[in-house]
Swiss-Prot record:
PANTHER family: PHOSPHOGLYCERATE MUTASE (PTHR11931). It comes from the Bacteria. This is 2,3-bisphosphoglycerate-dependent phosphoglycerate mutase. Substrate binds at residues 8-15, 21-22, 60, 87-90, 98, 114-115, 183-184.
């Protein structure tokens, strides 16, 4: 049996302020750092050990990985960072408060932008200061690879190449892997692993800082998955994510 652990980054400052974050490189709050340490403790208590980690190029995910591995005394493991694990790009919504945006456009429209499979938010202009094309961490990407906005379908399409070409082969070699990423990049992977329909993925919410363990067969098909930790706290965390766009 193969185990894979998925971990959404701890609470960021913009999570706390209920803003659309996307590719903006905001850091963790003190609570978010504590969530990451606690995630590490939960994984250590569960007997989990890792050989390698994959994360995005955004500091909230990187710092979550650092803190979790520090808690597990695994700071030495190999870490691979890729833009393909970034949060989905929220286009012109990045930086806006979710509740205020719901009051302006309506909760139903904002829910479509946040959770539908194939409807992206309004596009960002390349002249906008938020456009990531001038960021050196994306200097090796072609202009076509740098998004102006993304729906979940777009996020799935950019995530799956690194899954098929890099992560899955390591799992098949017996490597013990953790992926520390973002709400929507992890939703993209969960959709693929669990073969969730485009309609049902709307209702899937992934909380910050709580490890999600997948047990996979030799073909990397899920046998079961489960979150570590207190289940009542988990329910509250999932409900909190679901309620973020209420006006």
């Amino acid at each position: 049996m193969i185990k894979l652990v998925l971990l959404r980054h701890g609470e960021s400052q913009w999570n706390r302020e209920n803003r659309f974050t996307g590719w903006h490189d905001i850091d963790l709050t003190e609570n978010g750092r504590n969530e990451a340490f606690q995630a590490g403790r939960l994984m250590k208590e569960a007997g989990l050990v890792f050989d390698m980690a994959y994360t995005s190029v955004l500091k909230r995910a990187i710092r979550t990985l650092w803190n979790a591995m520090d808690s597990m005394d695994l700071m030495w493991i190999s870490v691979f960072k890729s833009w393909r694990l970034n949060e989905r790009h929220y286009g012109a919504l990045q930086g806006l408060n979710k509740s205020e945006t719901s009051r302006k456009y309506g909760e139903e429209q904002v829910l479509v932008w946040r959770r539908s499979y194939d409807t992206p938010p309004p596009l960002l202009e390349k002249s906008d200061a938020r456009y990531p094309g001038t960021d050196p961490r994306y200097g090796d990407l072609s202009e076509a690879e740098i998004p102006l906005s993304e729906c979940l379908k777009d996020t799935v399409e950019r995530f799956l190449p690194i899954w098929h070409e890099t992560i899955a082969p390591q799992l098949r070699k017996g490597k013990r892997v953790i992926i520390v990423a973002h709400g929507n990049s992890l939703r993209a992977l969960v959709k693929y692993l669990d073969n969730i329909s485009e309609e049902d993925i709307v209702g899937l919410n992934i909380p910050t800082g709580i490890p999600l363990v997948y047990e996979l067969d030799d073909d990397l098909k899920p046998l079961k998955n489960y979150y570590l930790g207190d289940q009542e706290a988990l329910k509250k965390a999932v409900d909190a994510v679901a309620g973020q766009s209420k006006a």
